[in-house]
């Protein structure tokens, strides 16, 4: 048995009155984004990226649109140091991108960091020390005053070296393990650092309040953010930043609520990479904003390519249900879901809708480089007529009547059920063609001639079980006349219950598709389909196919 008595909440709620953010129902603009993939993400990999891989990843982040990129902890390893020097010396940092470097508040590490970053066109020096109760007591064995001294000593050295080294430097301070720190004490430490750094509106400083470990529900963190928003000094000269992790599975919620509460900047990783359960997912955050009509200022229009590069370089797998990015996130197997999606797509097309409102799909898959045929409607034993019909129409142009879709659906689901697998669009087409299209055994129409005398007179040459027979009959139209001729020659008892047709292609050589449903004397219904450049021939082939399905 598990023993819950060994656990208790380890966070520090703020006093009442710091929850005005709850009146807001959505984030109205994108934050400043900072990718920490090359530091937090890289340090969490089983095999960290090589120099060449980091360069490729950096270029991908730039292409996506990140304007701030944490490129590493240059004092931690030669690879991290050389990566930063390569970016600077080979002039690989675009004019609108600022690199960020991480350093602990320790003299020799700060000095090594400035050695690495000298000559950078723009760089954020991100210095930090841990402030939580657990870290103070168990790791550092220091008092609050001593921990604050570490922060202020670090700030003094950072400020001093920024004046000695060549470069354009901005500054960021993080009270690491903020979520396990008394919030008033965290503010006290941050304000002491701000007093040293003396930010101004035109040279602001970043104060980053990390969810180093998720310890509370997201609204508790949002209240803490609002408290800091109200109590930090130099507020018009401070960029309030958040850095959520995902230990409780609510990293995205933490970031969103923090933005409602005053956070202006988010540090994040692609696909939620990072220590333990990962950092907050930049893709989910950005595309969730996008789904509310907010420009995220990040370009994920070719998300499959980004996914492929990420998986190759990091050797990590993107889970199939990862929001927006996973292989199955737009997939509908359920019959009722497929039917609603198919109808939603049809409604959108018929009404020329610009705003996206399709059931079950939060954003248009095309916007992020996904396709309807491969990503949305997926066929297995749970699928329904709507989805199966959608696959045939989207991929091959066949717009089956609803009742025929239902009949085909039973065949398709049976094949999937017995084979215990998902069916491709090609396999669905094969089942349709083999079961309904242009069937010529045991009955076929060899030729038919028509004359308009007291209606339509058809002279039809039939082949039944290899025997030919010529029959003449009258009907209200050509197809009715042929049907009457077949019944006269064979004694079959059926009624033309359903007929529809449409063009499969465009142009003078386009093919027509026809569908026929027959109601038989015993109450059963059979279906057939025909295709031909001559619409009359297509209709006759559909009729014959329906007869042959009896």
Predicted regions and their residues:
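Alpha/beta enzyme core
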Residues: 2-9, 33, 44-68, 84-94, ...
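A mid-to-C-terminal "edge-of-domain" accessory segment
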Residues: 2-39, 293-472, 508-511
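A glycine-rich helix N-cap at a beta->alpha junction
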Residues: 93-103
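Catalytic alpha/beta core domains of metabolic enzymes, predominantly
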Residues: 216-350
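A conserved regulatory-domain signal marking ACT and ACT-like small-molecule sensing domains
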Residues: 451-458, 466, 472-524, 533-534
